[in-house]
Amino acid sequence: MFNTKQQLTANKLLEFINQNTHKIFYLIGFAGSGKTYTISKITKKFLVDELIENIYYCAPTHKALKVLESYIKSNINASDKDLSNKIKFMTIHKLLEFKPIIQTETGSKVFKSTKESKFLKNISKNLVVIDECSMISQEMVDELNKYINLYPIKIIYMGDPKQLPPVGEVESLIFSTIPNNYQYHIVLDEIMRTNSVDIKAVCSVIRNWNLNDQINQKLIDVFNNSTTRRFRMYHIRNDYNKSSWFKSFIKEIQNNEVPIILTWKNSTSDYYNNIIRKFIHKSEEIDNYMINDYLMFNNYYASPENNESFFTSDMVKIIHTTTVTKILYNWSEQLISKPKTDLDRNYNSLIRKISKLDNEFKINILQVKRIQSDVVSSNNTDVHIIHVITFSDLNRYREMLKNIKEQIESFYKRFRIDTIVSKLWDIYHTKLIEPYAEINFGYSITSHKSQGSTYRSVYVDVKDICSNSNKTEMQKSLYTSAGRASERLGFMIE
């Protein structure tokens, strides 16, 4: 059943599909306003009615794509299975045929276009749906526009301009280039992710906030008018043990729930992770990963044990730890046994320098269970294995990576031999970085890292977020944080 705006979207999309003048449809909506639900229902009907032949569902990240794919597939019935062959899921990188390339100058992994996209070159009667468009960088938008200008492409952009933009950009180019009074631009403004009237009201207050006004009283009004107490306001005290937010948070942990505290600064998240871990473990000695810790993945990770995938922001709980000491890689294997040229000798000199660096670390082999994921079911009891550099060795590990990186960069600047240096960078990534999960403790993260995720219970450090001097960015961060909650939302204020 569609609401009024969703039905308008259905009518306008049908009109959009049946015309050839305009190539872009903007479906803009509040966080949790039902954009994906609306598009999935409408485009499914387009396929059934043979108005289109195929749909490419795309997103900027693997995590966002998996969330999208999981939702779309859950709405395909057994009788609709023949439609599955007409629905493709891919990242925008794949759509554009971007491939990961290691830059020989710096060793950084970047995505670059390697050839013309076969998906967009032969796109007649195919539709492209791009979700989370607030996260699309200017480079990606420029590349998409090249194809839009060349081929009969029709794209639906879905997103929310009040969400945080790509890192380093003031606003996503998608939103800043929407023409005035454009006929294929619809805003969904009723929040559907949560059934909580309170959370919807808070998101609305933040979204419509005039930054010259004080917001506290408007939030207090929402709190005072609440009948469900899904929205709470807490005062931050110097003695956190006496704070009602802290007692509430710990109670949820003890009930095996997965609450999260959202902040602006990484240092503030570190503070919350530390005080919560000290309470849970009843110890000041928390310099390592411990049983019952909640962990969150900072990046995609494939376990070397069984290639099990974990996505950015997936959360796990440690149930067992084992520690081994290991030399990460024996660099002497790369020595040229019979150097014949000056280049060979200089290369061997580089390898010897790298070999002298401390390359022995303690590795935690952690048995974990999933407790939160927007991609994979976290209700199962399966035990997974992940490898991490021991917490107490992390600084030394990062220093080693930095030193090796500098040595390889220096060698490249001097000799400019791409083949040799590319091989070294490959070892650097596959032997030293990729086998080990990049994780953080999972009780608190920044609002930026939370984008695209949904949590049952969210606590927001309003004081920390409002310390951002960029008021527009601050508003988007606060709005993003509030929109992560599905059942309970708490604002922590002075």
From Swiss-Prot:
Coiled coil: none annotated. SUPFAM superfamilies: P-loop containing nucleoside triphosphate hydrolases (SSF52540). InterPro entries: Coronavir_polyprotein_1ab (IPR050534), P-loop_NTPase (IPR027417), UvrD-like_helicase_C (IPR027785). PANTHER family: DNA2/NAM7 HELICASE FAMILY MEMBER. This is Uncharacterized protein R530. It comes from Acanthamoeba polyphaga mimivirus.
